[in-house]
Amino acid sequence: MIDISKIREALPHRYPILLVDRVLEVSDDEIVAIKNVTINEPFFNGHFPQYPVMPGVLIMEALAQTAGVLELSKKENTGKLVFYAGMDKVKFKKQVVPGDQLVMTAKFVKRRGTIAVVEAKAEVDGKLAASGTLTFAIGN
């Protein structure tokens, strides 16, 4: 398990854009993390005030950060950054609302030099909320 202090060491993100609360499982190429979604998230002020829904793009950002924690926690990547280079085959299946716990899984499926491809998914209560293929570049 990786707690928030280690996540903050790995990622440059800070409030209000840090979207990973805790890592539950980690291996060489796969990670499972959570984001506890609360009504206090700043994006709910405008998306949407009468019916708060987590923006899909922020779910994908949370997945990208999850993959970033895995990559940047490795000793060989100390001091480096992970740059989000693209996403493909993104699907949104379930709305994420205040009170939900987003369980995020990212699995690295391809690496070539400083480029990595990740299959990622986010679930709420065991149901798929979003999924997609993310591409990253690792650099200084």
UniProtKB/Swiss-Prot annotation:
Q: Which keywords does the record carry?
A: Cytoplasm, Lipid A biosynthesis, Lipid biosynthesis, Lipid metabolism, Lyase
Top-level taxon in the UniProt lineage: Bacteria
Q: What class of enzyme is it?
A: lyase
Might you name a Gene Ontology BP term for this protein? lipid A biosynthetic process
Q: Which NCBIfam families match?
A: fabZ, PRK00006.1
UniProt lists the family membership as follows:
Belongs to the thioester dehydratase family. FabZ subfamily.
This one is known as 3-hydroxyacyl-[acyl-carrier-protein] dehydratase FabZ
Which species?
A: Streptococcus mutans serotype c (strain ATCC 700610 / UA159)
